[in-house]
Amino acid sequence: MSRCEFGVILCLLLPAGVVESAGVDRPNIVFLFADDQRADTIAAHGNSNIQTPNLDRLTREGVSCRQNYCAGSYSGAVCVASRSMIMTGRHWMRIDDTRNWTGLPLLPEVLGKNGYVTHAVGKWHNGRPTLARGFQSGKAIMMGGMCDHTRVPLQDLTGEGELTNSRVGDGFSSTLFADAAIDFLGTQEKSTNPFFLYVAFTAPHDPRNPPESFRQAYYDNPPPLPGNFLPQHPFDNGQVSRGGRDEGLAEWPRQPDVIRDQLCEYYGLITQLDGQIGRILDALEKHGFGEDTIVVYAADHGLALGSHGLLGKQNVYEHSMSCPLVVRGPGIPGNTSTMAMTYLLDLYRTLCGYAGVEVPVGVDGYDLRFVFEGTQKSVRDSVFLAYQDKMRTIRQKNLKLHVYPEINYQFLFDLEADPLEMTNLAKNPDRASDIERLVCEMKAWQQRLGDTLPLTVETPKQKEIDLTGRSRLPDKWQPKWIRDKYFGGRDTPDSQGNPAKKRNE
């Protein structure tokens, strides 16, 4: 076994065990989970163009993981794979049954069997059987991947695992989910058991229709375009040529004014969500849970939104695979950051550790408690990112290698000098040894994960692509003003692909 193979296997498998950690025994756990939120959209992390006072408060009171990643996805619905990894603690390549997670103990399931009251609120995109197996109850559950934020289909989860009380929520999605979370906290004041409250928002996922006052505030003071904005992606990465709903939310080539307005709407969703985070944090204090509760704030992945000419998250750039992770709680020093490279799936081991619960056999990742508490600087030497059979990426320290097997193309970025991933160093002969080392590391990860994708092909596809003029019809979740603004008033196609009649809204 090579040295790099051994290092990767240790990184993925080394059991952290259940060891003592500073702070109270059996803390409550509140997991606040955003949808499609870029890592660079928290003001306290250096973005002066966005208003996030409550997330800023959370960063002042906790630790921020500044190099946190989603590991990628087996499908265009990256959120499904991301949530699967969090709930099972396994890399997506090691989840054989991606829908039902057969035979895999789920994080809330394990906590529930060890005395925790487990309750779910909000988005669940992984099927009813897993929801019912994982949680003892739930309110304001939105089954599926997305919805119009003003027309949220809601259900409640009973103790028997049934979904009941189907309704359309009267209010904005993030507000409805915060209301349900706050209601649950009010029921726990006299409970003698700790609780695990999972609140999965569907913001800032599109449709990007925040309440008008929130989007108008950013129209009046718009954020700049991303520093790596491009009208088109410069080559066929295997995904853009296939289309996809995310990339169809604006025409090619991307127009600066269109992307700027979509950024305003996206920021408006985040600021509105931030207010609901503040309400939940205040409710924790009101009900006496502030001192003995672990609060996790994270997102399932990032989003391009104009970066590299892309809109979606079906890629392996930093803007799409990195995502926020902020944790507050007993024993965690406030106003601190860590540059340890972490995965979202590490939260399984970490939260089991805080709960004093034995980690099930087969769970990947690391317990991050000592990273959060400042006594450990790092947990892994590299991170491996992958999207379907189209892209493979390895990051080690400041170097990041992208491999696109279908076109036999490599990109090497120095993230310290080039955090926006714009300058390809792969053709530089002085970097040949770096590429060789990173390919070795990548292959070691592939071997461990059972990833048999070749990194080159005998007959590569054409690299060049021009998507000028490509567009698509809006999906059923886009409200009328978005259809009018970005789709020329066109409507959702019917089952035969014909434009449907206009809806009056």
For every predicted segment, state its role.
Residues K443:
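Sequence context surrounding c-type heme c attachment/ligation sites in exported
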Residues V19-P405, Y409-F411, P419-C440, L453-P454, ...:
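Formylglycine-dependent sulfatase
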Residues E416:
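Residues forming the ATP-binding cleft of Hanks-type serine/threonine protein kinase domains
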Residues M1-S2:
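N-terminal secretory signal peptides that target proteins for export/translocation
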Residues E5-A16:
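Bacterial N-terminal signal peptides
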Residues Q447-G450:
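Short arginine-rich
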Residues T452-E464:
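Mature extracytoplasmic/periplasmic domains
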